[in-house]
Amino acid sequence: MAMTDSNPTRCGYVAIVGRPNVGKSTLLNHILGQKLAITSRKPQTTRHNMLGIKTEGDVQAIYVDTPGMHKANDKALNRYMNRNASAALKDVDVVIFVVDRTKWTDEDQLVLERVQYVTGPLIIAVNKTDRMEEKAELIPHLQWLQEQLPNAEVMPISAQQGHNLDALEAQIAKHLPENDHFFPEDQITDRSSRFLAAELVREKIMRQLGAELPYQITVEIEEFKQQGHVLHIHALILVERDGQKKIIIGDKGERIKRIGSEARKDMEVLFDSKVMLNLWVKVKGGWSDDERALRSLGYGDL
C-alpha cells in the first residue's frame, strides 16, 4: 500500500442519492470546484449515473451522481433512471443521502426505505440550511432524521453556498478504504467529452423552456471534431412530437439560437477551446418508452 508521510492512501466510491431536484448535482459540482453535472430547477434533470473524481493529496473520492429516485415508473426512461439510482447503492464505500431541510416528500420516503438497508457508512446531508434565519428550528428536523436512520451521520450543508462541505468531505475521507488510487490525479470524470457536450445542450433546453418543457427530449452528438483551434460539434435534439419541435425552435428560431449560444459558452470553458456548435431538432415518436431506442441513444442496460 502506497504511503505518504505516514498517511495511508485512500480511494473509494461515494454514491450521492436522493429524490429529484434536491441538490445532488449542485453538491457534486461544488465539491469538484467546477461544473461537471448539469443542473436546473426541473426534476429529473440528471438521467445517468456519472462519476466525479476528486483527488486531494492521499485521498481520491469517486463520487457517483445519480438520477433522483421517483415514483413514476410508467415509461422505460423512468424505469432506467430508477434502476440506475438504486444500483448506485451497491458496491460503494459511502452513501450520501441528500434531503431538503424545507420539506419531506413521498419520494424522500422512498429513498429512505432504500438506504435503510445500506450496511456501510451513511451520511444524511441536509441541504439548504443556509436559508434558515433561526438555526434552532433545524434541530427537531435533524433529530427526526437521526431517529429514522440511527446508524447514519446527519450533517447540515448548503450545496449552493458550500457551507460545511469541508466537514462533509473530511467525514467521507475518513470512511474510504486504504487503496491505491484508481484514476490519474488529473482525471475528473469517467464520461466522454461527447457525453458532456450533449448534457450541456440538454441543460440549456431545460433552463430555457420552463413550464413549456417537454420532458421527452434527449440530445445526441453526431460530430465532435477538433480542426485547428476550433472544436466542431453537431448536436441532434430528439423530441417526440411536432409541437415539441416548434417549442424548442421558437419564434423565427430565436429560442434554439439562445440554447446554442449558452451551451457553446459553457463548452468553451469546459473544453478550453473555441467551439462551433450546430443544433438540429428531429421528431422521433415514442423514443422515451422504447427500450431499443433508449439503448441506441446511450441509456445503457435496460
UniProtKB/Swiss-Prot annotation:
Record-listed GTP binding positions: 18-25, 65-69, 127-130
Q: What is this protein called?
A: GTPase Era
Extract the ranges annotated as region (G1): 18-25
Region (G4) location: 127-130
Q: What residue spans carry the region label G3? A: 65-68
Subunit note: Monomer.
Molecular-function annotations in GO: GTP binding; GTPase activity; ribosomal small subunit binding; small ribosomal subunit rRNA binding
Query: Residue ranges of region G5?
Result: 157-159
Family the entry assigns: Belongs to the TRAFAC class TrmE-Era-EngA-EngB-Septin-like GTPase superfamily. Era GTPase family.
On whether Aminoacyl-tRNA synthetase is a keyword of this UniProt record, the answer is no
Question: Which Gene Ontology BP terms does the record give?
Answer: ribosomal small subunit assembly
Role = An essential GTPase that binds both GDP and GTP, with rapid nucleotide exchange. Plays a role in 16S rRNA processing and 30S ribosomal subunit biogenesis and possibly also in cell cycle regulation and energy metabolism.
Record's InterPro entries? G_ERA_dom (IPR030388), GTP-bd (IPR006073), GTPase_Era-like (IPR005662), KH_dom-like_a/b (IPR015946), KH_dom_type_2 (IPR004044), KH_sf_prok-type (IPR009019), P-loop_NTPase (IPR027417), Small_GTP-bd (IPR005225)
Occurrences of domain KH type-2 (ranges): 201-285
Q: List where in the cell it is found.
A: Cytoplasm; Cell inner membrane
Q: Which keywords appear in this protein's UniProt record, sorted alphabetically?
A: Cell inner membrane, Cell membrane, Cytoplasm, GTP-binding, Membrane, Nucleotide-binding, Ribosome biogenesis, RNA-binding, rRNA-binding
Statement: the UniProt record of this protein carries the keyword Transport: no
Encoding gene per record: era
One Pfam family recorded for the sequence: KH_2
